[in-house]
Structures are given as structure tokens and as C-alpha cells.
């Protein structure tokens, strides 16, 4: 989906008019109309405000061009599981179980994170060593552990 489609769908699902959105974002109703027609896309700062207003990530607003994973534990991220920063903005880098209010929830080593994640993996019961090997290869590639 394109931004115009995602934006329009989210606005309508929240029961907001174009004018309501314009007032909340401090833009004109004409700007909102142009976004919905696909004539323009908002600037980055406005995208952040829309993200907060609609409760979705910028990645989702832009049609999910990237597959996001938590940069601490490697869990695939959807809007429902993304962390929030102290200002309430969605943090697209971490899941809600690793990050809250600008800090990591677990102060742990990489190996402790591996062991913490294994029970939550779908194949943990059948192949715990395979899961362990996968996590040991994945975690060093993530921002928290670089």
C-alpha cells in the first residue's frame, strides 16, 4: 500500500475528518487532502506527528517498505509490539519487551539474552540447540550488540 492509502484508511478507522486531522497536526485541510490524493507526502517531522496521532509506525504509514526486527532480541516487529519512547513516539528499533521510556528493560549480556529468548521461540521445544545457534549468530548483527 502507498502512504495515501494507509493514511486515508487510518484516518477513517479513527473516525476523524480531514479537518480534524489538519487541526491536530497544525496543517491545512488542503494539505491533508493532497496527501490522500497522493499529490504529496508529508515531511519527516509531520510523519512523526501522524505516527503518534494514529498510533502506528512511520514504516507502516509508508506502506511497510522494510521488515523491522528488534535490535536487541531479534523479534519481528509490528506496530502492536514496538516500543515507545518517553515522548510517546513509536520506536521502530526495539520491541516493547526490550525498551521502554528511553532505556533497555533488561541489563544483560548477549548470552543471557540468547537464553532469555529461546523459550519464546516457536521451535524451542523441538530444537533448543538449533534455536540457540540461530540466536548466537543473529544477536551480534543487531545494533544493541555491535
Could you describe each region identified by the protein language model?
Residues 70-73, 95-98:
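Short cysteine-rich clusters marking metal-coordination/redox-active sites
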Residues 81-92:
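Short linker/helix segments within small regulatory modules
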Residues 5-24:
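Short basic helix-loop element that most often maps to the first helix and adjoining turn
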Residues 7, 21-22, 32-35, 61:
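Conserved hydrophobic/aromatic packing and binding residues within compact polymer-binding modules
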Residues 45-60:
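DNA major-groove recognition helix of helix-turn-helix/homeodomain DNA-binding modules
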Residues 97-116:
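Short metal-binding segments enriched for Cys and/or His
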Residues 25-41:
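Recognition helix of helix-turn-helix/homeodomain-like DNA-binding domains
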Amino acid at each position: 500500500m502507498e502512504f495515501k492509502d494507509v493514511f486515508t484508511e487510518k484516518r477513517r478507522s479513527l473516525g476523524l475528518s480531514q479537518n480534524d486531522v489538519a487541526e491536530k497536526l497544525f496543517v491545512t485541510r488542503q494539505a491533508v487532502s493532497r496527501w490522500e490524493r497522493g499529490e504529496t507526502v508529508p515531511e519527516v517531522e509531520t510523519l512523526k506527528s501522524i505516527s503518534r496521532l494514529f498510533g502506528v509506525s512511520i514504516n507502516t504509514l509508508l506502506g511497510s517498505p522494510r521488515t523491522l526486527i528488534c535490535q536487541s532480541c531479534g523479534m519481528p516487529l509490528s506496530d502492536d509490539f514496538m516500543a515507545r519512547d518517553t515522548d510517546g513516539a513509536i520506536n521502530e528499533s526495539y520491541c516493547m519487551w526490550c525498551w521502554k521510556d528511553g532505556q533497555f528493560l533488561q541489563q544483560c549480556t548477549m548470552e543471557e539474552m540468547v537464553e532469555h529468548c529461546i523459550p519464546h521461540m516457536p521451535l524451542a521445544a523441538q530444537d533448543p540447540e538449533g534455536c540457540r545457534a540461530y540466536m548466537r549468530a543473529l544477536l551480534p548483527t543487531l545494533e544493541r550488540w555491535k
